[in-house]
Amino acid sequence: MTQQQAQTHVATEGDREIVTERVFDAPRERVFQAFVDPELIPQWWGRRADTTTVDKMDVREGGEWRFVTDGPDGNTAFRGVYRAVEPPERLEQTFEWEGMPGHIVVETATFEDLGDGRTKVSTRSLFHTTEERDGMLASGMEIGLGESYEQLDELLAAGAAVD
């Protein structure tokens, strides 16, 4: 299964994974910074109709993160633990929607310097079961991810992230 949301490529791999790719028109260091800076996260993370608040963001191995989104459908929270932080190449973390506690996903994001001022971000999300993976896809995550990445494009174009 392969689907396209804006320029974000989303595919399933194996029985329990979702793999995404997106190319950003910015150097790798700037893109990585946007993923780890608590002041930048609220400017791009989540759907356009939502407001994101960073409740906790301790970007180090073993550090915790928690984001709360508030929008037309109410508020919800997501949380996890950073398992690996390797600037500007790789982030690995757990991801859990507090509305379904115990369904923890392991997400690995890699940041590839394409050599022309652009960066490819690839994420691999590993679920416990095929049903959990398929439930995430059915939840509208592709729309939310697409909107988030569009907002990140805009943020990077405005020069908001650190060089």
Which positions does each model-derived feature cover?
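Hydrophobic/aromatic beta-strand elements that line small-molecule binding cavities or substrate pockets
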Residues: 20-22, 55-57, 78-84, 95-96, ...
